[in-house]
């Protein structure tokens, strides 16, 4: 019986450690880019479940599954030659660093969010663009006034089932964690 209690306690504490070991980095970068840290946490949970070395099906890397193209855009925008060099010579290494990955992922999220700022479905549209690309969001809203769509109406219009599930899952987790405080 004691071994069961010890094992359960260990599993609980490991689980808590695993899910929250990047909280400080997430909070730091979320503040810089004015994104709710619980949203960034929820996005990382969905993307990789906090596996910093994760590689996606089409070459996305790290916690926030950032593409090499996005990393190179970020490096160019920073104007720092060291980041440009690293993004060209070892982009996987750059994106496998949790701090850089979260920084670049938050930068990209904010860049996408600029397109949808102030809309009722701002967060859902930004998440959909993060997952499937902004051109898909435009496609899903082309025959309506996108500035007036509610979040639920937009999610219903998402034409890729996996993206619809991705957006819904992140929003649900985000709202659950935001309610806990």
Which functions belong to the PLM regions below?
Residues 55, 60, 131:
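Conserved catalytic or metal-liganding residues and their short signature motifs at active sites
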Residues 58-86, 104-107, 149:
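Substrate-binding/active-site groove segments that recognize
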Residues 124-181:
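Catalytic and substrate-binding regions of cell-wall glycan-acting enzymes that process beta-1,4-linked
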Residues 5-52, 57, 75, 99-102, ...:
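Export/targeting segments at the very N-terminus of extracytoplasmic proteins
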